[in-house]
């Protein structure tokens, strides 16, 4: 993904102290990089979509017919909700280290609050929330820059939901 102000300003947090809501911040040599609030917003939009897909998972999902462009013009069938759930889970598992993965599983997947997570993992509140922010930044960047199809996780499935949240 090409990171510039026009891509990041729509999902940046207005009250961010680093970017002031612009979505980009200056680092060494005057280079602009996306702010961490943008990555956290991307993760939260993906996570909200994940929760919606899981909540609707008890019902039979619809099968989508997709056209594959090319010589033969084939068609494929897919289940978008199940694919999104699988992509979200597998990408998260692949990107996080053991400690972050444990917190991710307890807090995001199982829904434990911060008090229960801190008690179970024997960590203090500050360490827990710093790790949560680090997880959101790391996975937000990963979901936005996912190759070969970053649009699979972010653009078509999450961006409309992100605009509705913001």
Describe the function of each predicted region.
Residues 110-127:
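Helix-turn-helix DNA-binding module
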Residues 94-113:
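Short amphipathic alpha helix immediately N-terminal
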Residues 1-91, 144-166:
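N-terminal interaction/assembly modules
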Residues 78, 94, 122-125:
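Short, charged/polar micro-motifs that form catalytic or ligand-binding hotspots
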Residues 89, 93-97, 118:
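Amphipathic, well-packed alpha-helical segments that form the structural scaffold of globular domains
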């Amino acid at each position: 993904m090409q990171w510039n102000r026009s891509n990041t300003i729509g999902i940046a947090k207005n009250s961010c102290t680093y970017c002031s809501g612009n979505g980009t911040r200056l680092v060494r040599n005057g280079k602009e990089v996306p702010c961490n609030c943008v990555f956290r917003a991307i993760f939260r939009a993906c996570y909200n979509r994940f929760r919606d897909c899981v909540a609707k998972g008890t019902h039979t999902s619809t099968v989508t017919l997709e056209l594959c462009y090319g010589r033969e013009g084939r068609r494929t069938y897919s289940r978008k909700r199940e694919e999104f759930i699988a992509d979200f889970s597998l990408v998260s598992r692949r990107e996080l280290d053991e400690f972050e993965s444990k917190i991710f599983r307890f807090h995001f997947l199982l829904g434990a609050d911060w008090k229960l997570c801190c008690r179970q993992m024997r960590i203090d509140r500050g360490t827990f929330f710093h790790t949560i922010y680090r997880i959101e930044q790391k996975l937000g960047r990963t979901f936005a820059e996912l190759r070969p199809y970053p649009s699979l996780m972010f653009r078509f499935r999450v961006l409309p939901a992100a605009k509705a949240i913001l």
